[in-house]
Structure formats: C-alpha cells, structure tokens
UniProtKB/Swiss-Prot annotation:
The gene is Ccdc91. It comes from Rattus norvegicus. Its main location: membrane. GO terms for biological process: Golgi to lysosome transport; protein transport. The keyword Protein transport applies. Residues 1-27, 48-79 are annotated as: Disordered. Homodimer. Interacts with GGA1, GGA2 and AP1G1. It is found in: Membrane; Golgi apparatus, trans-Golgi network membrane; Golgi apparatus, trans-Golgi network. Residues 1-16 are annotated as: GGA1-binding motif. Keywords: Coiled coil, Golgi apparatus, Membrane, Phosphoprotein, Protein transport, Transport. It is a peripheral membrane protein. Residues 211-414 are annotated as: Homodimerization. This is Coiled-coil domain-containing protein 91. GO terms for cellular component: cytosol; membrane; trans-Golgi network.
Length: 442
C-alpha cells in the first residue's frame, strides 16, 4: 500500500549521531521516529510492512535485542558492541534495499511485541537509562499512531466502499435515465413516422379526390359534347330530308368537318386533363423530369397533328370517292328503289334512330371504358411513382405515351366507325330522297 493511503504527511524528523555527523531521515513514515542512537541509521518503511514484519519470524531481517544489549560484566565493550551493531544494521540495510524488504534496526518489532527493550542496566550509564525511557515513550507513541493509522485506514476503506456504492447507484441511475431518454426518443421517432405516414396518406387521398373531380368534369363535358352531337345529327337529318339531293354532298362535308372538330376537341380536352393530373401528382419530380416530359409531349403533339392531318386528307379522299360512287349507284338503282321506298321509309327511320342511339350508347360505353382504363392506369402509375425511384419515372412516362397513343388510336377507330355508320345512314336517306323525287325532275 502506498504512503498516501494514510493522508497527508508532516515533515520527517531527523536523527543525529553521537558526533553530530550523519543524520537518519524518515521521509516516508513521518511518525516512525526513533531516539538518537549513536551511529544508527533508520530505513523507511510503511505501517503495513511493519505489521507484516511483526507477524513474520523475529529472526528474519531484524537484529535481536541482545545484539544491542551490553553485557553487565563487560561495560567497557559497549562502544565496540554498538559499532558491531551499526555495521550489522548497515549490512542488512544494503541487503534488504535490493530485496525491497524494510529493515528495522535495534529490534523495534520485538520490542513492541514484548513491551520493552532489554537495555544495559549498569549504574555507570545514566544517559543510557534516559535514552531507554525516551525509546519506550517513542515506542508507545508509535503504537498509538499505528493504531490511529489503522483506524484511519479502516475509516478510509469504509468511505471508499460507500463512495463505490454511491458511484454504482449513480451509474445505475444514469443508465436508467439514458434508457428512458432512448425510449422517449424512440417514441418521438415513432410519432413522427406515424405523422409522416398520415401526411402522405392525406396527400394521396387529396390527389385521388382531385382526380375524381377531374374525371367527373370530363364525363360532364363528354356528355354535353355527345348531346350536342346528337342535336346536330338530328338537325342535319331533318334538313337533309327537307332539302334536295344536291344539298346532301354539302351536308356530308359539313358533318365530316364537325366530326373532325369534335374529335380534335376531345383529344385536346383529354390531353389537358391528363396533363393536369400528371402535374398534380408529379410536383416533387417536376425539376428532374420536366424537360423530358416536355420533349415527349412535343413529340406526341407533332405525331398526333401529323396523324390527324394525314387522316383528314385520307378521309376526305375516301368520302369524295364514296359520294361519287354512291351518286352513280343511286342513279342506277333510282328506278328500282322508288317503289320500295314507301314500305321501307318508316322502317328506315326506325333503324336510323336505333342505329344512332346504339352508336351513341356504344360511344358512351367505349368512352367510359377508355376513361376507366386511363384512370386505372393513372392510379397505378401514381402509386408506383410514390414508391419507385426517379430513374424508373422515364420508363413509366414512355409507357404512358404508348398507352396514350393506343387510346388515341382506339378513339380514332371509334370515330371512324361512327362516321361510317352515319355515312351508311345518310346513303339510305339519299336513296330514299331520290326515290321520292317526281318523274319530271328525272
């Protein structure tokens, strides 16, 4: 055990020799001071080593008491005996210094165990008796200080144990506090996660509601356009019946132009609505995908415009040829169909009305299916867009463009089928009108 275990030290005492020469200093154990003995040097030692040394054999590493006691018969050999004792002590000190064993000269341990030193009791040495009494006093004070140091040591050990217990309690409290903080942080993190999920769900619901509103508006516009189309067809039908045969060509041409305009209007409306839905659902990806989307939209627009132009030219040529051929056929079969017109006129009107109604219903059904397909595709793409990375967005846009082209093709085919149906009905009406003309016009 270190010397610092016993608290602060005082200044070490010095020991003077008989001639006032060499001094013995005890820097490590301030209370281990001994009376001045001529030529004796004291080695430093701690109280624990003293106790251990006391429990060991008296003969190991110490001088016996009789080594320093003068014989009563040989008082004159006192100085020589002291010199021999000093030489032995010095030899033992030099030997025990290398072995780290404390050496107590003059047999102090044995003296403390037995309670007194056996000193020379010759009447000639009064100074020796005085030194013996002083030595006894020092030994008693040494024992008292040793006991006090042991008590201090026990007290310090108890304080250390109490401090260690307090440290363990504080450490446990600190760990509990950290665990509570970690639990609170985790709870806060979960709350933030739930809040974030709820906000994402609200945004998704808002997007779906906006899309449903757009779809309802598109349905209303589509119904109004279909209604307008029906009104225009009925008006054209009445005017075609009332007018002469040479007005049929102009009516067909005007109807064809109106159908093409309605087709273009529906395409533009569908394109605008889809663009608005895409803009609302891809606000977060607008910066990275805006340029690509604009390029694709421009290409799609140019392709659609070129396709519409080609289709208009082709349809114009086909309708012109069909009208010319039909006119020739009508002139050939005019005489044959004049007699059958009376019986088939009413039937033709019913068939035309049914055909128009069927065409309108088919148009509505196909429009609803196309809108549902577009909505389903848009919902699927919006859900994927919220989950997938930015690099997949380009592929989704390409797929959407292809789907849009397919829908445009379906719409175009549907319009062509309705136009074909209208032309067939108009052909029958023209044949009926030609059949009802008087013979003198012919």
């Amino acid at each position: 055990m270190d010397d610092d275990d016993f608290g602060g030290f005082e200044a070490a005492e010095t020991f003077d020799g008989e001639q006032g020469g060499n001094q013995a200093v005890s820097p490590a154990v301030p209370w281990a001071t001994f009376p001045a003995v001529s030529g004796v040097r004291l080695s430093p030692a701690s109280p624990e080593l003293i106790l251990d040394h006391d429990r060991s054999s008296p003969s190991s590493g110490h001088l016996r008491s009789d080594a320093v006691i003068s014989s009563p018969d040989d008082t004159r050999a006192d100085s020589s005996l002291v010199n021999q004792t000093i030489s032995k002590v010095q030899l033992q000190q030099s030997a025990h210094t290398h072995l780290n064993i404390p050496l107590f000269p003059l047999g102090l341990t044995d003296e403390s165990n037995h309670g007194a030193l056996a000193l020379e009791d010759e009447p000639e040495g009064p100074g020796v008796h005085v030194s013996n009494s002083q030595l006894r006093q020092k030994i008693s004070s040494l024992e008292t200080k040793l006991k006090a140091s042991e008590e201090e040591k026990q007290r310090i050990k108890k304080d250390v144990e109490s401090l260690m217990e307090k440290h363990s309690v504080l450490e446990k409290d600190f760990l509990k506090e950290k665990e509570q903080d970690a639990v609170s942080f985790q709870a806060r993190y979960r709350e933030l996660q739930e809040k974030h999920k709820q906000e994402l769900e609200d945004m998704r619901k808002a997007g779906h509601e906006a899309l449903s509103i757009i779809v309802d508006e598109y349905k209303a516009l589509l119904q109004s356009s279909v209604k307008q189309q029906l009104d225009a067809i009925e008006k054209q039908y009445v005017s075609a019946i009332e007018k002469q045969a040479h007005r049929c060509e102009e009516l067909l041409h005007a109807q064809h132009q109106r159908l093409l305009e309605v087709l273009d209007t529906e395409k533009e409306l569908l394109k605008e609505k889809i663009q608005e839905a895409l803009t609302q659902q891809s606000q977060e990806q607008k910066e990275t995908l805006g340029k690509c989307l604009q390029e694709e939209m421009q290409k799609n627009k140019e392709t659609l415009e070129s396709a519409v132009k080609l289709e208009k030219e082709a349809m114009k040529d086909v309708i012109t040829k069909a009208v010319e051929e039909e006119r020739e056929n009508l002139e050939k079969v005019h005489a044959e169909e004049r007699e059958m017109w009376k019986t088939e006129h009413a039937r033709d009107q019913e068939r035309v009305a049914e055909a128009i109604q069927a065409a309108v219903q088919e148009q509505q059904r196909m429009s609803q299916e196309a809108v549902k397909a577009a909505i389903a595709e848009e919902q699927r793409r919006s859900e994927k867009a919220m989950e997938e990375a930015v690099k997949r967005t380009r592929d989704e846009l390409v797929e959407y463009v292809r789907e849009q082209r397919r829908l445009d093709q379906v719409t175009r085919q549907r319009s062509l089928s309705s136009l074909e149906l209208f032309l067939s009905c108009a052909q029958k009406q023209l044949s009926a009108l030609i059949a009802t003309e008087p013979v003198d016009i012919e």
